[in-house]
Amino acid sequence: MQITKNDTVISLNLTEAFNRYVLSYTATTPLRCTLTYAEQGHERVEEFFLEAGEDMTFASYMDGYLRHMVADAALSMTARTITHEACEFTLHSFTVETVPVLAEKTFYFENERYRVGVELCWGGGLSYLEDKKCPVEGLVNILNNFDTGRLIQQSYYGTGDPPYVRGEFMGNSWVYNPVQGGDRGNHKSKLIDARVSENEVYVKCRPRDWGHDGGTTYSYMENWYRLDGDYLVVDNRFVDFSGWNHPKNGQEVPAFYTVSYLNNYYWYDGDQPWSDGELSVKSDLPFWPDDWPYCTFKPKAGNTETWSAFVDDGGYGLGLFTPNIGHTIAGRHMYDGSKDPHAASCNYIAPLKAVKLQCYKPVTYSYLITAGQLEEIRARFKARKDDITNTAWDNY
């Protein structure tokens, strides 16, 4: 069938109870869709987006999945084009099912080294990382999770021009900023889907727009989390369906928050990467917006050793390595040395890559995380420095 700017209604009439639906389809252009369903005597409608492609699959939980909501029947769906092109669309199948709720809030997975928490109610960002070999008494969760902005999570920056309506944060006008966890008002992003296998946790969400207090974005974020010995490996994917023209911006890849206790920031500032040269350290980092130059770390030409870490005075801490970046911003907010993951104080790292978001075209990248003594962190990243390249950015 041909889909245009006008809604095309497709009757479903599936009368079995469900909290998850799955489409198999082929579409020549992206589509904006709705699902109408019955729930406790009421008709409800929720929105979803389909990427263009052949023999594609889209799966989504119902809006109330984490609250154990179950719909009574799938009545119909609508589809319309987002771009100016008509779409040739084939719905191969539309199925519904009732699946268990993985967790109402945090889903945990672990190996012999780490226990990791995925915050399902906050878009599937990482809210918990416990190192089972941590030598520091009282340090359990190394990550800060004070609010929806404080996770290890995806965060992107786009347009500030009409028709987009700017938001506001800390007294500043704020551009389009899809954030995995939610928005500045602590509204939660919607969990779209999640899957758990023996070695991997997959999550997908529809993020909020950070500068707005409520509302959502026309975008999806996906993560694949894998524990591999002493490493946490994270793959990321983002697709924007807004149709807006975005300028090039420094994208946080990812936004990364630890507890305040890890007070020393280490990085390699030389020009002979992976040669075990002397590391640089700053132990007095301020809140990053208060002094951008002091909190900005630009690698020298040819330096591919772009990991960094926050560690305590004994050298223990947490490191992050995102290859093929432009520079890194790091800082400490309300530094007080707290080990409390819920504290207002925190440390922050954001490797930045200058990328112009292109609607309907996926952004993909990966990074590594490891905990331990500083020399162990460095050695582990060196051992796997060629495993991730993030060269997809170069052709985006």
Language model region names:
Residues I82-V101:
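Exposed low-complexity, polar/acidic, P/S/T/G-rich flexible segments that act as propeptides
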